[in-house]
Design a protein with these regions (language model features):
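Alpha-helical oligomerization segments
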Residues: 156-159
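Aromatic/basic-lined ligand-recognition segments
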Residues: 150-153
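Extended amphipathic alpha-helical scaffold segments
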Residues: 109-112, 137-148
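Residue-level signal for the start and early helices of compact helical domains
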Residues: 3-6, 82, 139
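Leu/Val/Ala/Ile-rich N-terminal alpha-helices, chiefly Sec-type signal peptides and the beginnings
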Residues: 1-75
């Protein structure tokens, strides 16, 4: 059984992993399914029975986020990617703004449920599933007053 502090670290590692994948996708146009699938599965798991059900084996499934988080808060400060740190902080700020919008939270929940049907039909990382989530983002979160500015290769950013 993990305590609340460990749960918070794991949740933060998931945010850092998402930010890291955004940076990697913007720079290279590709991300690892091993790193992205656990995050997508967590999005679609809207009724977990316990905390472990959200991310499974966090040491394996969130290793990218845990390693980067360790770089950020570790004493050495080596290998800190400023873009990943900026995206992480931006995601946390966006979450704070979203938490005040009950209407948008409900819309997101319904949209995630709809996108989960795409994931069941195709696969969790299939382009149709990702497109459904991207459309959901465009119709909800992108309308908040705060926007995350992603930098990278213009070719990949257009997609």
């Amino acid at each position: 059984m993990i305590n609340p502090n460990q749960q918070q670290v794991i949740a933060l590692a998931a945010v850092v992993q998402a930010a890291s994948l955004v940076e990697q996708l913007a720079r290279t146009g590709d991300i690892s399914g091993d790193a992205s699938d656990p995050l997508l599965q967590a999005v679609f798991n809207q009724s977990p029975e316990n905390f472990h059900d959200i991310y499974g084996n966090a040491r394996v499934n969130l290793s990218v986020g845990l390693n980067h988080l360790n770089s950020i808060v570790g004493r050495t400060g080596r290998d800190i990617n400023p873009d990943v740190t900026r995206y992480t902080l931006s995601l946390l700020l966006l979450e704070r703004k979203l938490s005040k919008r009950v209407d948008m939270l409900k819309t997101l929940g319904n949209g995630i449920h709809s996108a989960s049907r795409q994931a069941e039909h195709f696969s969790i990382g299939h382009e149709n599933t990702i497109a459904a989530l991207a459309d959901l983002y465009k119709s909800t979160l992108s309308n908040l007053s705060f926007r995350i500015h992603v930098t990278g290769n213009p070719t990949y950013l257009q997609n």
